[in-house]
Amino acid sequence: MAPWLTRVEKIRILFFVLTTLAISLFLVMPHIAIGIESLQKDTGKDAKLKFSFVRKWGSNGTGPGQFVRPHDVAFDSKGFVYVSDRELDNIQKFTHNGTFIKMWGSEGSGNGQFRVPYSIGIDSKDKIYVVDRENHRIQKFDTNGTFIAKAGNGRGSSDNQLDRPEDIVFSPFGIFVADTGNDRILKFNSNFTLVNKWGSKGIGDEKFIHPHAIDVDSKGNVYVGELNEPGVKVFDSNGKFLKRWGSNGTGDGEFSLPQEHIAVDSKDRVYIVDGASNPRVQIFDTNGKFLGKIGTPCKMSTGEGCIDSDGPGPLELGDGQFSKPEHVSIDTEGNVFVVDRGNQRIQVFAPMNNESTK
């Protein structure tokens, strides 16, 4: 400061400078903090989930380890994999890496026989429940394929009857069945006694047009997908409607029809298999926010995105590409198993940049 200023004047000037600086910092700091918070959101929660191809198994045929129209894939507590085939009317059991172990089932209506086996549910005691669609029943087996019991008293709409059921899920909140032909969801207790039901045919929040895909999150909320209406409806475990999300289209977060299957992982991420015209698996949070997808497109008409492994001849779908995918399941490590029905195979994908699903 200039030497001719008095001590009092110097103090006044210093006080003015410090006060001005303090006010400036007060005005600027919130904007700095907001910028940091936004950056954290952009690089963290909003990052898209990504998966890498791991392995595949299966081919077209009727022998062990082969499929014609594979439909569902499920796991028991030891990691064994079970696949239903709705054309061969059987269930096949594999190791977690895809090595064939055994198969059971044949066409018919007797115990242990199937007419279009659809979904597979496995309870906490490793009992296998198969939705036997055209026999309008659910059959129960042990892990060796030995028949134990069945539920369903013929085709109908009474409480002890089913009409072309298509999905089943076990949860701490109950056992839920998509009774597709009756346009309703059934809830059973652990003894398979009916405790609740909801839905009727029609368009609306509490009505269904052939509900055929269901799963349950950690809070007991039930997610329902329909054959002829795009999007997902969400209910509490007692059937109270909560919300719906999704619309028709081919963009991220949109669906083509039919939506084939719904699966919820241990982090409450919702995986939805899109329709045959847009074959992919999309991933959402519980509010319908798009998080990522699995599956790369192949346009057979132009060859864009397809492979030609043997020179002249038909184009093929490579690893990570699907033809008419039908079901998806997530194991305890977060690996995603996709039933690639049109290619008669199972494809497995591992999480890359994602949080652990444990």
Model-predicted segments: where are they?
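Eukaryotic scaffold repeat domains enriched in small/polar residues
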Residues: 30-358
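Bacterial N-terminal signal peptides
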Residues: 17-27
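Intrinsic-disorder-associated interaction segments
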Residues: 4-8, 25, 46
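N-terminal Sec-pathway targeting helices
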Residues: 3-19
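Short, aromatic- and cysteine-enriched interfacial helices/patches
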Residues: 2-5, 33-35
